[in-house]
Amino acid sequence: YVRCYKGLRRAALSAIVPLSQPFVMADAGANPEADALSLLRFAKLGEIYCQAVLGVEKPRVALINNGTEPQKGTKIYREAYGLLTASDMNFVGNCEGRDLPFGVCDVAVCDGFTGNVVIKLIEGMGRFMTDGLKSVIGANTKTKLGGLLVRGELKKFMKGLDDTAYGGAPLLGISKPVVKIHGNASEKTVRSAVIQANGFAERKINEKMAEGIASLTVTGA
């Protein structure tokens, strides 16, 4: 059966956000509320996942907050800031939502409520941009000709925003590979999710995460 690692009360739903520089989001929706210690553990899980999947040796970990100053946010987020600062992770401080698309971190940490809102907003903005570009390019003959001139670069740009290649959203912190996908997911997404789960098993990512949680020391509380 599937269970959380020893010493871990809550697993985190993770997602790779495919922007100009992809980053890992943890938690992306599993826990609407999370205490400071859980946020610290989500950060460690996200760090290991980022190393394994994105190949970042020392991921920059940021805490999503309503300001960059250490004293910003709720009591829980201020406590989490202290725990992350005292940890051995490459913690770069708080990060505001507006900065996420610009490569300020490799791992973005938050509770599942915040993470899910951010993910859905990014998805919506992606659709908004796509529909807007199509509308502008198809407006008249001049814009259609302009669209032909930039077609290749636009395709590259849109490909960079495609999340289907990453599969689904893995549940981090449990003993077996579990990947969540939408019920209306495309064939490409389903295939990528199967490959993703198989990769977890072959590369023993779950075991590495269990070791990471077991070795995590808590100071600064």
How would you name each of these model-derived features?
Residues 55-62, 213, 217, 221:
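Long, low-complexity, intrinsically disordered polar/charged segments
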Residues 100-101:
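Structural alpha-helical scaffold elements that stabilize or flank donor/cofactor-binding regions
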Residues 32-97, 106:
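Glycine-rich phosphate/diphosphate-binding loop of Rossmann-like nucleotide-binding domains
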